[in-house]
């Protein structure tokens, strides 16, 4: 209790002290600016006094900006509202909302451009002689100074607004013309005639020729087999015509016998139907036999097809017959071995070893033999 009472008495004594001497009471906020009294914080923002840091940004916080001017009301909380900021100066309108826009911050000074001052925080222009207002802080990455031979991006010259003007932009056409006029010619390799890789060219052409030759020979052998089998089938049809004649004679005999037997029956309606059916079959058989006999007359290949076809050309039936012949060939003939016109050894296949792949002096994805 004694401790608490003594602390309370100390607080009462501190509160009874004059206001301007109680350092801890006046600015409880350590971010606010203390004036020229003992215990002044040198890290805070000092104005035109000895020890002023000109490199420090002048307006770190718009809520601080305190002046030691006569008539300053120290008891008033200086920045209760950033839109008020009242000074007791002649001509100051305390009813005017002082900070309508924090980017404007207007002072009644001569020559001060009120619309200009804080339009863009990256511009921050001062009325100094030789200061380029359009140049300063347009781009925080450029930050150009009026110094001779100052070159950040390899494109600044000591002319105001040089890079911003479109007159100095180089079009692609100008760039191309400039390259043609002043650029170096590309190096041209002129090889002597004996330096050309004749052997490599010949080997490439030879490999192509070998592959085409092999394919043409295999095609020729297939065509020879097809022609041979067609001749065979024509001979077989000629041999089969005699057998077909005998078969036709036997069929006629059988049909006559059957018709005699059927005529003896009593069911006349069924008899008529049977006779009609047999006559139709007979007509079909005679037509087939006529076509076969016609085929046997013209047995000279390759003209016997054209005499049978209507207008001497190719037709779908002809193509279908050819396809049937080739299918017959494929099913009946054994596969013929290809004729070797020159010896063709097996290609040498490099054996594959599971070697470790080393990372040093080697690109990924290539094997060791690429570098040997």
Curated annotation (Swiss-Prot):
Show the segment(s) annotated as Disordered. 1-100, 122-150
Answer whether the UniProt record assigns the keyword Repeat to this protein. yes
Q: Does the keyword tRNA processing apply?
A: no
List, as start-end ranges, the regions of compositional bias called Polar residues: 38-49
Q: Which UniProt keywords apply?
A: Repeat
Quote the biased-composition stretches of kind Low complexity, using this chain's numbering.
Answer: 1-37, 53-100
Q: Where are the sequence repeats?
A: 29-40, 41-52, 53-60, 61-72, 73-80, 81-92, 93-100, 101-112, 113-119, 120-131, 132-138, 139-150, 151-162
Q: What is this protein called?
A: Proline-rich P65 protein homolog
What is the organism field in this record? Mycoplasma genitalium (strain ATCC 33530 / DSM 19775 / NCTC 10195 / G37) (Mycoplasmoides genitalium)
């Amino acid at each position: 209790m004694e401790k608490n009472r003594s602390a309370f008495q100390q607080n009462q004594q501190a509160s009874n002290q004059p206001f301007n001497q109680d350092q801890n009471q006046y600015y409880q906020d350590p971010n606010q600016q203390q004036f020229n009294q003992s215990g002044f914080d040198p890290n805070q923002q000092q104005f035109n006094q000895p020890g002023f840091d000109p490199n420090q940004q002048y307006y770190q916080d718009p809520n601080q900006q305190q002046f030691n001017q006569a008539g300053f009301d120290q008891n008033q909380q200086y920045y209760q509202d950033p839109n008020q900021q009242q000074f007791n100066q002649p001509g100051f309108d305390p009813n005017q909302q002082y900070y309508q826009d924090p980017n404007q911050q207007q002072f009644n000074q001569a020559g001060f451009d009120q619309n200009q001052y804080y339009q863009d925080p990256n511009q921050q222009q001062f009325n100094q002689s030789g200061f380029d207002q359009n140049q300063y802080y347009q781009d925080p990455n450029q930050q150009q100074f009026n110094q001779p031979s100052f070159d950040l991006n390899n494109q600044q010259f000591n002319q105001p607004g040089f890079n911003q003007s479109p007159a100095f932009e180089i079009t692609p056409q100008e760039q191309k013309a400039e390259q043609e006029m002043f650029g170096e010619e590309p190096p041209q390799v002129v090889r002597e005639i004996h330096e050309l890789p004749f052997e490599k060219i010949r080997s490439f052409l030879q490999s192509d020729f070998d592959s085409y030759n092999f394919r043409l020979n295999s095609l020729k052998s297939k065509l020879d087999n097809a022609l041979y089998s067609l001749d065979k089938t024509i001979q077989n049809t000629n041999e089969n015509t005699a057998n077909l004649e005998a078969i036709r004679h036997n069929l006629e005999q059988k049909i006559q016998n059957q018709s005699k037997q059927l005529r003896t029956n009593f069911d006349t309606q069924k008899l008529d139907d049977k006779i009609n059916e047999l006559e139709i079959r007979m007509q079909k058989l005679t037509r087939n036999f006529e076509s076969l006999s016609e085929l046997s007359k013209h047995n000279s290949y390759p003209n016997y097809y054209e005499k049978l076809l209507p207008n001497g050309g190719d037709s779908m039936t002809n193509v279908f017959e050819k396809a049937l012949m080739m299918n017959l060939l494929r099913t009946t003939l054994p596969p013929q071995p290809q004729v070797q016109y020159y010896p063709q050894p097996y290609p040498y296949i490099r054996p594959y070893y599971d070697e470790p792949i080393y990372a040093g002096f080697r690109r990924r994805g290539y094997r060791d033999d690429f570098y040997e």
